[in-house]
UniProtKB/Swiss-Prot annotation:
Organism phylogeny: Bacteria, Bacillati, Bacillota, Clostridia, Eubacteriales
Family matches, as CDD domains: YajQ_like (cd11740)
Family affiliation: Belongs to the YajQ family.
Name of the molecule in the record: Nucleotide-binding protein Dred_1927
GO molecular function: nucleotide binding
Role noted for this protein: Nucleotide-binding protein.
Signal sequence interval, chain numbering: none
InterPro entries: DUF520, UPF0234-like_C, UPF0234_N, YajQ-like_sf
One CC-aspect GO term: cytosol
UniProt keyword list: Nucleotide-binding
Native source organism of the sequence: Desulforamulus reducens (strain ATCC BAA-1160 / DSM 100696 / MI-1) (Desulfotomaculum reducens)
Amino acid sequence: MAKENSFDIVSRVDMQEVLNAVNQALREIETRFDFRGSKSRIIFENKPEITLISDDDFKLRNVIDILESKLIKRGINLKALRYGKVESAAGDTVRQVVTLVQGIEQDIAKKIVKAIKDSKVKVQASVQGDQVRVSGKNRDDLQLAINVVKGTELDIPVEFTNYRTI
């Protein structure tokens, strides 16, 4: 019987690393001269969203820059962030909600499957919930499928996990 190899394509964010990045960003905001006396803060409660609050749009943009730099240093891909619109908040402040993308949405999963099928690589790709499973007889074909997915323009960060031989 021939062995079947497979792997999963997933999109996930390490919430502990996000928490660490938020804490580092808060520490920098507290110590920076241009934020002295400011109402700028970052709220993250282990939900897949971060709330940014600041005095005005300019300081909010600076808070975003600080947060993004800390996320990059912690290994979080910025494609995993979805920015909401800037809205007015209480006390002459502005607020913006940043959502963290977890899982692969159906339309993006279909795009991945289509890209793999269009490449004519001898593998099967199927959507399974919020991930895509790719299976095939040859490991080299799986490597080609990984390269196809890496070459596809996606709006989310993807990881290749759960390699196995059945």
